Amino acid sequence: MFKFVFKRILMVIPTFIAITLITFALVHFIPGDPVEIMMGERGLTAEVHQQMMHQLGLDLPLYQQYFHYIGNVIQGDFGASFRTQQPVLTEFFTLFPATAELAFFALFWSLLGGIILGTIAAVKKDSWISHTVTAASLTGYSMPIFWWGLILILYVSPQLGLPQGGRLDNEFWIDTPTGFMLIDSWLSGVSGAFENAVKSLILPAIVLGTVPLAIITRMTRSAMLEVLGEDYIRTAKAKGLSYTRIVIVHALRNALIPVVTVVGLIVAQLLSGAVLTETIFSWPGIGKWIIDAIQARDYPVLQGSVLIIATIIIVVNLTVDLLYGVVNPRIRH
């Protein structure tokens, strides 16, 4: 087991290095001058421009900028935002609860719905129910996030009276010590704040969780069909066990093992999908922060946010690999 864990951890190192190189290169190849965007055209002389470039370290060769950046990252310094002059880590962890809250509920409903729909589609194989679920999951997987979000805002939100953007309506003023709006609105005791926070979360969570729902549904259906054809399932039927008990207790438990392996990919999907989702719904999280940084050519924010998110995804995938190694010892050899 130790050898298996060591190999998995060792594989993370080249991945991390590749991410830093690719991120640094892509960020610096974005068209536009960050100094011009920061200062505007008014009062930006050649002397001021050169001074700002030197102050930000942008006048150095790219390889020197890269090694300087990596040296700071190793020390836990991700730099400061060009726009706000605040440390990137401080801004990231200030905004992260909003994204984490949205991603958690998107993952929760997509897991719950995907497992239920996938199981039903497998049990009702070759029926209209199975075909409908399969077609719906394919549609959900192919649907553009921005289009789906706009449809919900234009047609579903007015019908159900759901907020079209933001985490809480402006009529509510509460303290946010944790950054998690559901927790803070509950603790505040302000009448109607918690209900409004829940309503504000519904549409963004639906949009963000649609693609993961489709993935989990198809994965669960495929795994369940394979498990339901195993000999021990036929033995359980021969013993007279109820079909419901066979499906839930014996089949589903084993069918969920492959589903665990895609959780890491789903986390990556949620974090990447949050960029568009948060922009559509004016959700003040990491995704919207990244979009604003792209428009402002804020290199430290772009490099730091991508690196931190990539690290989170790597850690999640590593954890999933290790857990899968515990559940299924065969992959350790």
From Swiss-Prot:
It is a multi-pass membrane protein. It holds the Pfam family BPD_transp_1_N. GO terms for molecular function: dipeptide transmembrane transporter activity. GO terms for biological process: protein transport. The chain crosses the membrane at residues 9-29, 103-123, 136-156, 197-217, 256-276, 306-326. InterPro entries: BPD_transp_1_N, MetI-like, MetI-like_sf. Residues 96-328 form the ABC transmembrane type-1 domain. It comes from the Bacteria. The keyword Transmembrane applies. Keywords: Cell inner membrane, Cell membrane, Membrane, Peptide transport, Protein transport, Transmembrane, Transmembrane helix, Transport. The keyword Protein transport applies. One of its GO terms (cellular component) is plasma membrane. It is found in: Cell inner membrane. SUPFAM superfamilies: MetI-like. Part of the ABC transporter DppBCDF involved in dipeptide transport. Responsible for the translocation of the substrate across the membrane. Belongs to the binding-protein-dependent transport system permease family. OppBC subfamily. This is Dipeptide transport system permease protein DppB.
